[in-house]
């Protein structure tokens, strides 16, 4: 079984895959809050508790972290507790098969890279990936699977929390779809601005990408939503085509299998 670990600023998601290649299947996933202070031992304790009987069935691990302190602890955890298991940490220098056609490839987040890889693998077409996480990332992937760049905006929670904390008369509200775009009270007005406002932000960015890049003006372009808040925002958009909740986990699986295949190819002449 392959364990995939997706560490973001807000949540950590674990995914467990059986099989490989076309026969791979995500059989279970877990979600927990990210704590940048967690140690390798604490991470191992939590992971083992969630995995239960599957702990001893892990044959590989593929992980990414957008939180540097947690990435360091995951590296220690893998060495200490799963040292006998092949693992891949997606970071600069790791081969993903995604050409990064940007000014500074080392600045591109691992989450954006694996999302691009998974999108190209699933659809084999020009793709625009919208990841609704701590930040809202719009990533542009060519028909060849190249990462062309994109846009980063504040996430839904960050924007809502900032509005409440910086405004004396406003308070934090539950982020749900209001009954109308025209709010009848302060709570509904804030919910309308958040939900419909972010839907408009996404639609605006997607339309600008399609207008600016000739290769993205056709009907073959696929716009994919992923991330924690995708189920809330996607239904209000006009440009998003598909929802792939496990896109990052799928990308981590693909990176692991590509690196394992490469290692096998390097070993084969000596066998």
From Swiss-Prot:
Q: Which GO terms describe its molecular function?
A: ATP binding; metal ion binding; pantothenate kinase activity
Chief subcellular location = cytoplasm
Pathway the protein acts in: Cofactor biosynthesis; coenzyme A biosynthesis; CoA from (R)-pantothenate: step 1/5
Sorted UniProt keywords: ATP-binding, Coenzyme A biosynthesis, Cytoplasm, Kinase, Metal-binding, Nucleotide-binding, Potassium, Transferase
Organism annotation: Rhodococcus jostii (strain RHA1)
Binding residue positions for substrate: 109-112, 186
- Which family does the UniProt entry place this protein in? Belongs to the type III pantothenate kinase family.
Q: What NCBIfam families has UniProt attached to this entry?
A: baf, PRK13318.1-3, PRK13321.1
**What stretches pass through the bilayer?**
none
Sites where the protein binds ATP: 6-13, 134
Stored InterPro entries: ATPase_NBD (IPR043129), Type_III_PanK (IPR004619)
Give a Gene Ontology cellular component term annotated to this protein.
cytoplasm
Which cofactors does this gene product need? NH4(+); K(+)
- GO annotation, biological process: coenzyme A biosynthetic process
Q: Which residues are annotated as active site?
A: 111 (proton acceptor)
Name recorded for this polypeptide:
Type III pantothenate kinase
Q: Where does K(+) bind?
A: 131
């Amino acid at each position: 079984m392959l364990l995939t670990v997706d560490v973001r600023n807000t949540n950590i998601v674990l995914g467990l895959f059986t099989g490989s290649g076309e026969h791979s299947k995500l059989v279970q996933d877990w979600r927990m809050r990210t704590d940048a202070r967690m140690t390798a031992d604490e991470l191992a304790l939590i992971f083992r508790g969630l995995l239960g009987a599957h702990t001893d069935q892990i044959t590989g691990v593929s992980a990414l972290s957008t939180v540097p302190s947690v990435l360091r602890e995951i590296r220690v955890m893998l060495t200490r507790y799963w040292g006998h298991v092949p693992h891949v940490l997606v970071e600069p220098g790791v081969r993903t098969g995604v050409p990064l056609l940007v000014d500074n490839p080392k600045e591109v987040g691992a989450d954006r890279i694996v999302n691009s890889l998974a999108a190209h693998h699933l659809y084999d077409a020009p793709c625009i990936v919208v990841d609704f996480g701590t930040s809202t990332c719009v990533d542009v992937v060519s028909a060849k699977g190249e990462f062309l760049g994109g846009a980063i905006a504040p996430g839904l929670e960050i924007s809502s929390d900032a509005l409440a904390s910086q405004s004396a008369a406003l308070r934090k509200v539950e982020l749900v779809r209001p009954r109308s775009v025209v709010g009848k009270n302060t709570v509904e007005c804030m919910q309308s601005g958040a939900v419909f406002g972010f839907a408009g932000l996404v639609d605006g960015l997607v339309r600008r990408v399609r207008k600016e890049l000739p290769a993205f003006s056709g009907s073959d372009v696929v716009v994919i939503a992923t991330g924690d808040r995708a189920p809330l925002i996607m239904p209000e958009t006009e440009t998003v085509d598909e929802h792939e909740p496990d896109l990052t986990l799928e990308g981590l699986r693909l990176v692991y299998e590509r690196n394992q295949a490469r290692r096998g190819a390097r070993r084969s002449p000596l066998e």
